[in-house]
Amino acid sequence: MGLLIGDDLWAVVIFTAIFLLLVDLVHRHKFWTAHYPPGPVPLPGLGNLLQVDFENMPYSLYKLRSRYGDVFSLQIAWKPVVVINGLKAVRELLVTYGEDTADRPLLPIYNHLGYGNKSKGVVLAPYGPEWREQRRFSVSTLRDFGVGKKSLEQWVTEEAGHLCDTFAKEAEHPFNPSILLSKAVSNVIASLVYARRFEYEDPFFNRMLKTLKESFGEDTGFMAEVLNAIPILLQIPGLPGKVFPKLNSFIALVDKMLIEHKKSWDPAQPPRDMTDAFLAEMQKAKGNPESSFNDENLRLVVIDLFMAGMVTTSTTLSWALLLMILHPDVQRRVHEEIDEVIGQVRRPEMADQARMPFTNAVIHEVQRFADIVPTNIPHMTSRDIKFQGFLIPKGTTLIPNLSSVLKDETVWEKPLRFHPEHFLDAQGNFVKHEAFMPFSAGRRACLGEPLARMELFLFFTCLLQRFSFSVLAGRPRPSTHGVYALPVTPQPYQLCAVAR
C-alpha cells in the first residue's frame, strides 16, 4: 500500500476533522439545554483547555465567576465541568446534595500511578462500598491509635519539643522553616503508619520528603488536565514516566518502607500501627475478591495519609510563621496569651485551647487566608440533579470552589486580608463561622481534620512559646502570594528566630 499524497491525503485530513467536529457536537449536545449552567464557548475538541490557567486556577475561576455567576460550566476537551462558588451554593452542593455529589470523576492519569480496580485509596476512590470500607477503617484505626486521645497528644507534644530544639540550633542565622515543619508533621504520620519516628538527619527520611515536595503539581497542572481529558495520550510509550517522575519515585519509596515493615509484622501480636491493622484486615479478607484490602490499596491508603495528613498541615504551619513575621502585632498578642495561660515552664496542651481565644482565632485565620486547597478535590454527580435553577447531568465533574467561600466578600469583613478578628466577637471570645471550610464539608470532608486541628494548635503554640520570629533586617518583606499547586505553598522565605 502506497503512502497517501496530494488530494487523497487532504481528503483524509478533511474527513478526520469533520468526524472529530461531529463527535464533539454529539458529545456536548445533551449539555446545550436552557437549564445547563452558562460558561465560555468551548473550542471544538479542546473545549476550554486554552481558556483556563491551570497554573493559577483560583484567579481563572474568579474571573469566570464575575462574568457567569456562582454556578458556571466549562468543558475540558470532551469532559463537562461545573464550578460552584460562594458559601450558599457550595454548602448546598456538599451537604444538601451530598449523596448525589460525593462521587469522584474518572482521572485516567492515576491508572499510571498505582490505582486499579480494587485499589483507589480513600481520597480519590469512587463513592461506593469500597470507599465506605476504607474510610470506616481509616477513621476507626486513627481513633484506636490515639486521634482525639491523650496518647497521641503526648506524641505530638514530644515531636514539637524536637522541632523547637532544632529551631534553637538554626536560630544563629536566618533559615527557611518549611522543611523542618515537614519533618515534624511527617513524624506524627509515621508514628501512626509505621509506629516510629525518624531523626531529622535520616538520609532516607530526607530523600522521601524531598521527593514528595518536588512532586507537587505533577498531577494538577496543565499537562495532567490534558492527559485526563485525552487519555489516549497516556498510551504513548514512556510518557507517564516522564510526566510523573517524582510521584513515581515517591511511590517506590513508600513501597520500600512497606516491604520492610511487613518483615517485622507478627499477626499473633496486637497491631503496632495502621499498617499492621491493614495487614490484619488483608488476612481476614483472603479469598474475598470483593474486598478492598490488598497490597496495592495499602500503599494508596498510606500515600493518602502522607499527602492529606502531612502536606496540608506542614504547609499551613509554614503559612502561619510567615504571617507572624509579617504581622508582629498579632505575634505579640499570641505571646501574651501564651504567657498568661500556659507560661514558660510547662508545654502547651489541648486543654489550653478553650482558654486561648485569640490564638485559636489566629490559627483559624491562617487556614482561611492561606487557602491551601482552593478548588477542592473534584466531585462528580451520580445522577441528574436540579441545582440552583440549573440541570446538571449525571457524570458531570464538579469543582466546589472553596476559595470562593473562604474569601467570600459577602461573608468576611476583610476577605483578602489577614484579620484574626474574623473569628472573635466584640468581647474577644472565639466564634465559629459557617464559611470556614478548609477541610471541605459533607460526606467527603477531610477524615484527618481532628488530627490536623491538634497538630496545628500544639506545634504553633509550642513554637510561639519558645521563640519570637521576625523578617530579615534590610531585606524585602516576603510575599503572601502563594505558589499554586496542591497544596498552595508560600513562596520560599527565611525568618529569624530568637529564643524568648
Curated annotation (Swiss-Prot):
Subcellular location: Endoplasmic reticulum membrane; Microsome membrane
GO annotation terms (biological process): arachidonate metabolic process; female pregnancy; response to genistein; response to xenobiotic stimulus; xenobiotic metabolic process
Major subcellular site: endoplasmic reticulum
Residues binding heme: C446
Cofactor: heme
Induction: P450 can be induced to high levels in liver and other tissues by various foreign compounds, including drugs, pesticides, and carcinogens.
InterPro entries (UniProt xref): Cyt_P450, Cyt_P450_CS, Cyt_P450_E_grp-I, Cyt_P450_E_grp-I_CYP2D-like, Cyt_P450_sf, Cytochrome_P450_fam2
Membrane topology: Peripheral membrane protein
Modified residues (Phosphoserine): S249
Key words of the record: Endoplasmic reticulum, Heme, Iron, Membrane, Metal-binding, Microsome, Monooxygenase, Oxidoreductase, Phosphoprotein
PROSITE patterns to which the protein is assigned, alphabetical: CYTOCHROME_P450
Catalytic activity reported: an organic molecule + reduced [NADPH--hemoprotein reductase] + O2 = an alcohol + oxidized [NADPH--hemoprotein reductase] + H2O + H(+)
GO CC annotation terms, alphabetical: cytoplasm; endoplasmic reticulum membrane; intracellular membrane-bounded organelle
Keyword Heme belongs to the record: yes
Pfam hit, one: p450
GO molecular function, one term: oxidoreductase activity, acting on paired donors, with incorporation or reduction of molecular oxygen, reduced flavin or flavoprotein as one donor, and incorporation of one atom of oxygen
Tagged with keyword Endoplasmic reticulum: yes
UniProt cross-references to Gene3D superfamilies, sorted A to Z: Cytochrome P450
General function of this protein: Cytochromes P450 are a group of heme-thiolate monooxygenases. In liver microsomes, this enzyme is involved in an NADPH-dependent electron transport pathway. It oxidizes a variety of structurally unrelated compounds, including steroids, fatty acids, and xenobiotics.
Protein name: Cytochrome P450 2D26
Organism: Rattus norvegicus (Rat)
